[in-house]
């Protein structure tokens, strides 16, 4: 009875075998060639062997063709599904396991055949319904099955075996006609994968989610994505589905490829330096994720698919977008192996990268920003070379930090604002005398990446070496006051340069050189300035005292109304005696007379006239003076002195005596 049912089935479905055995089976056996992995034929030896065996059996007996056709169709379905999930982890072929799977499948098929004898009409009707359902199934439902099968996979590197994926609706048991329908379904599924990168972009994106069973809503696009990289060889092991929304790549396109291939050439050195510095930190801190983080900015390549740019992919230039990468080093979980082989430390380290796109800070041209706009810092040396740039400057200026470091900051100032910057740096040098002093300068224009200028307000601080008194670096905390004319700061700058006359260029060059020379000068100490100020004030005070004493002495001389005579000064040891003779005239005021004399001993001088004055001095020398005063009448006054044999001392002024004391 079993053979009769099989014979009737084979007779009724012989036409479907002839029509679909050549073309549909060929497309089904080479489904991996159209899946995006270079068009290589499938490496599944088991499925191809089963197809060849079925062709041989068909030429011999139709009776055996029934069982062989069922076994081949079901084996191709299940083996391809199993190898798609397990083939990525296999590094060596396992033919014995595949044979066991085939034997088990054949035994299950034979058991099912006994149950189909009593329900052959119902099975045929059910088979027809399944074929109709598979023929009318939408493309999004098949993609949903692909996504479910991929969700089971963990971190393995993809292989060509994993490409031959059978949608869930094409599974199940059936006859030879169902095997032909399965081959045609695989051919349709290959056409789905052959639809190009434009179709692949929508498979893991919003389109696949919205075209599902209707129970799930449209997925919200994410602004960032994450990926896991093996530190052993730099291969990408896992990416989040949001990479399609951010960069346009299909989710699986990064798997098995080096991450640095997607980084811009100018940023690869920065990426490598961050990795080399981050690994020792992770090892020293025990690879704790929260303690081994670092952040930097790079340019990542965007996908050139048919959906984003249409045809002619080769002729279009490669576009890059700025991203802020957060690095976290982790150790991969240990895997149990049958040979009890333990992985050494360091070989199982993983790198988790979270990439966030950086957008421009400006919405409209020439935008006036508020006082609450974020600040960013730029530090440069005394020679004007930029040594540090804050990552917050990327969205405001369009430059990555590595693009500015090592360049002269003078090249970014507007040529009409160089005179303002010269005054600013003069103030920087003056404020450098006091540690921690800061000031705000006038607004000035700064060149950004797209060739436009922004208006900056800056708070300046500086650091002076306390030993050499040389300026080490200048820090500017900038805030954008007015935005550029072009909102997108990441666009390429125009090739044409601003035309400036030769005279203006020479003047600008001279101003830049003057600024650099001024920054190279020695900064005076605050104590030296105080000493100079005190010394200047002391000199002014001494000059004032001398002038005051001169005025006092002149006032004393003008108090008499007649002639006056002054005697010399006599010094004995440390005592100073002054004698003066004043003559008074009745008729008028007399003049003054002076005289000098030398001698030793003691002498007294007396002047006679209308009035008398007496002066007595004792010392080693005697001075003699004669004064004559005239008015309406004539009066004379004389002073006599005695002379001795000793030498007279030089006269001493009042100011000198005060200074001597």
UniProtKB/Swiss-Prot annotation:
CDD domains: PAS. GO terms for cellular component: nucleus; perinuclear region of cytoplasm. Residues 591-638 are annotated as: 24 X 2 AA approximate tandem repeats of G-[TN]. Its main location: nucleus. Phosphorylated with a circadian rhythmicity, probably by the double-time protein (dbt). Phosphorylation could be implicated in the stability of per monomer and in the formation of heterodimer per-tim. A motif (Nuclear localization signal) lies at residues 53-66. Residues 1-34, 635-646 have a biased composition (Low complexity). The keyword Ribosomal protein does not apply. InterPro entries: PAS, PAS-like_dom_sf, PAS_fold, Period_circadian_regulator. Residues 108-120 have a biased composition (Basic and acidic residues). Gene3D superfamilies: PAS domain (3.30.450.20), Single helix bin (1.20.5.770). Keywords: Biological rhythms, Cytoplasm, Nucleus, Phosphoprotein, Repeat. GO terms for biological process: circadian regulation of gene expression; entrainment of circadian clock by photoperiod; negative regulation of transcription by RNA polymerase II. Residues 223-358, 376-482 form the PAS domain. Residues 588-634 have a biased composition (Gly residues). Pfam families: PAS (PF00989), PAS_11 (PF14598). Sequence repeats lie at residues 591-592, 593-594, 595-596, 597-598, 599-600, 601-602, 603-604, 605-606, 607-608, 609-610, 611-612, 613-614, 615-616, 617-618, 619-620, 621-622, 623-624, 625-626, 627-628, 629-630, 631-632, 633-634, 635-636, 637-638. Residues 1-151, 582-661 are annotated as: Disordered. Residues 53-66 have a biased composition (Basic residues). It is found in: Nucleus; Cytoplasm, Perinuclear region. Changing residue 85 to M: In clone SE-P4. One of its GO terms (molecular function) is transcription cis-regulatory region binding. Forms a heterodimer with timeless (TIM); the complex then translocates into the nucleus. Essential for biological clock functions. Determines the period length of circadian and ultradian rhythms; an increase in PER dosage leads to shortened circadian rhythms and a decrease leads to lengthened circadian rhythms. Essential for the circadian rhythmicity of locomotor activity, eclosion behavior, and for the rhythmic component of the male courtship song that originates in the thoracic nervous system. The biological cycle depends on the rhythmic formation and nuclear localization of the TIM-PER complex. Light induces the degradation of TIM, which promotes elimination of PER. The run of Gly-Thr is implicated in the maintenance of circadian period at different temperatures. Deletion of the repeat leads to a shortening of the courtship song cycle period, and thus could be important for determining features of species-specific mating behavior. This is Period circadian protein. It comes from Drosophila sechellia. The gene is per.
